[in-house]
Amino acid sequence: PTLRGKVCSFFSQGDGLAVAAALEDESYPIDELVYDLADLDASFRFCGEDNRWGGRLATACHKLYGNQTIPGYLENGVPPKYGFGAEQVVAGVHKNPLSKHAWVNELLGAGDIDRIIIEWRSTLRQISHAAELDWPRWTALQTIASEIVNETESPTITELPPLEYSQTKRVDHRLILRRH
C-alpha cells in the first residue's frame, strides 16, 4: 500500500483522505494542520457567512481529488462532514480555555463548541495512537497531536458525586399486579 493508503486506513470514511492530502502538500505547515483537523467534523455550523468548503484543508483535498464525489468518503472533493471555521474556534479555545463563550453567537452554541472540541481531541487521539510510518510529516503530526492531547482537558470530564446506597443495589424491574 501507498503512504496515502496507510494513512487512510487509520480513519473511517473520508477523514483519512483529507489527512493524507494535507500531509502530501509539503507547503502545508503541520502546526496549522493540527487545528484544521477540527474542520473535518464542523459541518455548516462554524462557517457563518463564509464558504463552508473554504480553508487550507479543503484546498489540499481539491488539489488532490478534484470535485470527486464518492458516497460516504468525499463530497465534491472533501469529506462529507467538512466545514470551514472550526479551526479558529478550536485554536482560540486551546490557547485560552476561558474564551469559549466569546465564540458563541446566534448560529453557534456552547454545545457546538464542546462537541467540536471533543471530536477534534478524538481525531488527535486517533492520530497519536496510530501506527508509525516512515514519513517525517506523519511523525511530526503524531508528535504534535500527542502533545496537545496530553496538555488539554476534555470538556466532558466531570467530577461525579458518589452513588447513594440505594443506587448500588440490584434493581428489580418486575411489575407486580394485585387481584382484588
Predicted regions and their residues:
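Accessory beta->alpha helical hairpin/"wing" motif in late/C-terminal subdomains of nucleic-acid enzymes
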Residues: P1-D31
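C-terminal accessory/interaction regions of large nucleic acid-associated machines
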Residues: A20, D25-H180
